[in-house]
């Protein structure tokens, strides 16, 4: 995960890495499973270990419109709903059988207490993700055929 976002793996020592892993639950998720549906509030933060997720919604014509893919080594976009504890504006669904690690709010708070620098790292990861989303939106406008 840290390599995906160009973070140094030296941020945590070996003991912290082992402790970090204990807070996440490994789950196997079948193809086509919804991790969250539009209108629900996310109860977990998901990390994609193997597989791929798609983020989509119904457009004004009632057609499915995919706007983002969460690949291996990234967190699910449903983290927006999870972090803010607001209703999700979109669906997140597996498109292949996947191995996902998840953590709930209570475990996140315990993790932040056990390893305080994790909170800063997660905040930085969220900022990097937001920057990627903004860049994508700007590119769609900038390079539009209009």
Predicted regions mapped to residue ranges:
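Cyclic nucleotide-binding regulatory module and flanking cytosolic helices
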Residues: 1-28, 81
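Cyclic nucleotide-binding regulatory domains
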Residues: 8, 33-95
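Short acidic/polar alpha-helix capping motifs at helix-coil junctions
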Residues: 15-20, 53-56, 71-74, 114-116, ...
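Short N-terminal signal/transit or membrane-insertion segments
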Residues: 19-41, 143
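A generic structural signal for ordered secondary structure
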Residues: 24, 52, 64, 100-103, ...
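Hydrophobic residues at beta-strand termini and immediately following loops
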Residues: 27-29, 70, 103
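Polybasic "coupling" helices that flank or enter modular domains
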Residues: 93-96, 101-146
């Amino acid at each position: 995960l840290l390599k995906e976002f160009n973070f140094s793996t030296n941020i945590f020592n070996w003991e912290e890495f082992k402790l970090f892993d204990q807070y996440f639950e490994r789950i196997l998720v079948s193809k086509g499973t919804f991790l969250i549906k539009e209108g629900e509030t996310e109860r977990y933060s998901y990390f994609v270990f193997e597989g791929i997720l798609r983020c989509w919604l119904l457009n004004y014509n009632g057609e499915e419109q995919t706007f983002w893919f969460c690949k291996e080594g990234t967190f699910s976009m449903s983290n927006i709903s999870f972090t803010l504890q607001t209703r999700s504006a979109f669906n997140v669904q597996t498109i292949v059988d996947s191995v996902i690690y998840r953590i709930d709010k209570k475990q996140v708070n315990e993790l932040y207490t056990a390893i305080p620098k994790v909170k800063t790292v997660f905040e930085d990861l969220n900022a990097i993700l937001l920057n990627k989303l903004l860049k994508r939106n700007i590119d769609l406008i900038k390079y539009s055929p209009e």
